[in-house]
Amino acid sequence: MYAQQIGDMEGTEGPSIITGAYSGLGARKEGAFVFFRVYAPYADEVFLVGSFNGWGETHRMKKDRAGVWETSLGKKEVSDGDGYKYKIYKNGQAVYLTDPCSVETDGEHYHNSVYRNIEFLSREKFNEKNNSEKDFSLIKSVYKFRVDGWLPATNSRQVDYERLADEILPYVLQMGYTHVDISGLFEEYYDFTENRSVRAPFALKGGREKIASLCNFVRLMHKASIGVLIDWCADESIGGYDADLAFYTENALYWLDNFGIDGLVIGSFECGTEFLRQLVHSVKRERKNACIIAESGEDATMLGFDGCVERSDGYLGIFKGMDSPEEEICAKASAATCLLFEKGRMLTEAGFETGREQDVGSPFDYEALSTVNNMRFQVFCSELNYAYLSDADIGECRKNANSVSVCERDGMRIVRRQAEDGELVIICDLLGKGGEWRINDGGEWQMIFDSNAILGMGDGALLKSECGTTYLRLSAYGSAVLKKTI
């Protein structure tokens, strides 16, 4: 992102310059002075302008051989909370640059950087202080929500994360999710030079006052054995610059180390797959235990991700011919069952489990639960999570699975997960016709999950054996999970 602010960056020595960017660039208090540093190798001249000098060109910055411009102010010249920018000249033209490494931006216009003197705990000290040494890398069922989507706050910058934890933690535990994925954390501002809205990747929405609040949110989640992921992505306009790679590596480490975040969920590949591959490798090199997953994408593992986590409605499109709300609820339940047991992970967007997607800036929609179908589906989502996580047979087959096969036949989707100690078969009715199917494999089978039975819709599934052959009968849009016992 910021490497492209001034001209083309081809041929620069980005990695050696920018590694350690957050600790070096931006506004940092060092002894009796506050140093301001920005990377702009092709600039002709750079000035530090801000509320401390009337936004005038009185603080000329000096450039080193690496392309980093620097100036320093005494502690009496700049105060905590002062706004500032970099005024950069190139070919006689000036542009104003918001500091890419600032931890806060102007709350009124989201445009000026704000100087803050903040000291973070290291990841080790964070864990030690909060007694948080649990491993949250095993991601199974994730609940995704926006920070301004659960509390009825009119201003998203005023989110109280401790109150948010009080509201959402009991619900997440009740529903059986293993992780939360938070979106909408980053401040945004309008970049007039590029005529678009830009994320401030180091700035938490709400500024410095919310940093301790977010750390407490993570602590409360960890105490309840819930992992914390954040929605994270590199700017879509980049793709390949070495300085950009180092910058976003540092940004990922900033969130992982300073806030106790357990992992990153990357939903956009628009900055380029090769750039993402290098980025994931770079972060993993610094933090081997960092969990980085893609929100979708079959090639995520090839890019170095720790797999992907599909949205719970991702399989809904394979179901055909739904004509009623009851059929849609049954199809949603089957889609979620099929996805979770086939992929091993699932991401539920807030509101999906109650039959209604969450509106940005709106609190949790309890009215959605006023309908019987939506209430049934919410109960089903909880039962699905707990069945997948707590059933010993499912857990062993999930953990030791050495092959997964998928096929569609006669309007059915059949998923097999085979392991040395057993086999799971997931069968879903895609066409809503219902009917009876023969399980060709010999042996004895046990039905351990029946979607329509949990929903209380249709006749549920029936497993029967005749003359050594096992038959499964499903009602319309039903799904069942079978465990081979012998």
Tell me the role of every PLM-derived stretch:
Residues 32-35, 42-44, 403-440, 480-483:
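Carbohydrate-binding surface patches
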Residues 141-142, 186-224, 236-258:
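Aromatic- and acidic-residue-enriched carbohydrate-binding clefts of CAZyme catalytic domains
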Residues 1-35, 56-144, 152-156, 163, ...:
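The feature marks proteins involved in alpha-glucan
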Residues 384-385, 437-462:
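C-terminal accessory region downstream of the catalytic core in glycan-modifying enzymes
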Residues 166-187:
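Catalytic domains of carbohydrate-active enzymes, especially glycoside hydrolases
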Residues 21-23, 344-424:
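Glycan-recognition and catalytic regions of carbohydrate-active enzymes
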Residues 80-81, 461-486:
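C-terminal beta-strand-rich structural cap/linker in extracellular carbohydrate-active enzymes
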Residues 137-139, 146, 225-226, 238-346, ...:
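Alpha-amylase-like alpha-glycosidases and glucanotransferases acting on alpha-linked glucans and related
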